[in-house]
Amino acid sequence: MAAAAGRLLWSSVARPASTIFRSISASTVLRPVASRRTCLTDMLWSACPQAKFAFSTSSSFHTPAVTQHAPHFKGTAVVNGEFKELSLDDFKGKYLVLFFYPLDFTFVCPTEIVAFSDKANEFHDVNCEVVAVSVDSHFSHLAWINTPRKNGGLGHMNITLLSDLTKQISRDYGVLLESAGIALRGLFIIDPNGVIKHLSVNDLPVGRSVEEPLRLVKAFQFVETHGEVCPANWTPESPTIKPSPTASKEYFEKVHQ
C-alpha cells in the first residue's frame, strides 16, 4: 500500500515537470529560427519557472577551474571590422578577459560589450586583451557592430567578437545552457601562460561590472611582481599584505589603528 501511494505521489509531481519540458522542447524545435530566437529571449529574460525545468548547463560534462589551463579555443572573429581566425594561442604572453554573452541583438548584452569596448585602452595598458563570445555567427556580429548604438547596436568596437556557432567553446568553458543553446554570462581571466586566474558566471538578466575584471587583472599582476597579496577591495593605491604571520602585522596595524 505504501509503495503504491508513493508511486502515485511521484507520478502526480513528476508529470507537470515532464509536460513542461516536452512543451518547451517541442515548441522550440518546431518554430522557425527567428521565432525560436524570440521565444527563447522572452522566456529566458522573464525568469519564469518553466525555464528552470528545461535548461541545464554543460558544467556536468566539464567545468574549467581556477589554477587549471584554460580550454583551447579557435574560431572566426570580428577584429576591427574584418573577419579573422582566432585561437587561444594568439594571446600567449598576455592576459585575456574572455567573456560570454547569450545573443546578439538583445538587451543587456550591448550594454556590457560597449562598456568593455570603451575601457579597452585601460586593459591594453596592463597587457590585457578582451574577447566577447556568443553562439551567433561572425556575420551576425558584424551586422550588430554596423548597427548604431542608439538603435541597440554596438557601433565601432575596440574589442574582439568571437563566433561560437558550433557552441563548442561555450560547452568547453561550462557555460552553455544545453537546451536553450546559448551561453550564460561567464567571464574568465586567463594569464599569459594560459592559466585561469578567475571565473564568474551571471544569470541571464543581470549585466557585469567592467571595473572589477580590470581591478583583478591589476591585482594578479601586482602579486606576480611584488610577491605580496591583495586584501579586500584592493586598488593600486591600497596597501598590500606580506604573506607571513609576523610581516602581515604591518598591514593590520596600519588599517586598524
From Swiss-Prot:
Active-site residues, Swiss-Prot/TrEMBL: C109
GO biological process entries: cell redox homeostasis; cellular response to oxidative stress; cellular response to reactive oxygen species; hydrogen peroxide catabolic process; maternal placenta development; mitochondrion organization; myeloid cell differentiation; negative regulation of apoptotic process
Modified residues (N6-acetyllysine): K92
GO CC field: cytoplasm; cytosol; early endosome; mitochondrion; protein-containing complex
Highest taxon above the source species: Eukaryota
Localization in the cell: Mitochondrion; Cytoplasm; Early endosome
Protein EC: 1.11.1.24
Residues the record lists as Phosphothreonine modifications: T147
Coiled-coil annotated residue ranges, if any: none
Physiological role: Thiol-specific peroxidase that catalyzes the reduction of hydrogen peroxide and organic hydroperoxides to water and alcohols, respectively. Plays a role in cell protection against oxidative stress by detoxifying peroxides. Acts synergistically with MAP3K13 to regulate the activation of NF-kappa-B in the cytosol. Required for the maintenance of physical strength.
Protein name per UniProt: Thioredoxin-dependent peroxide reductase, mitochondrial
Gene this protein is translated from: Prdx3
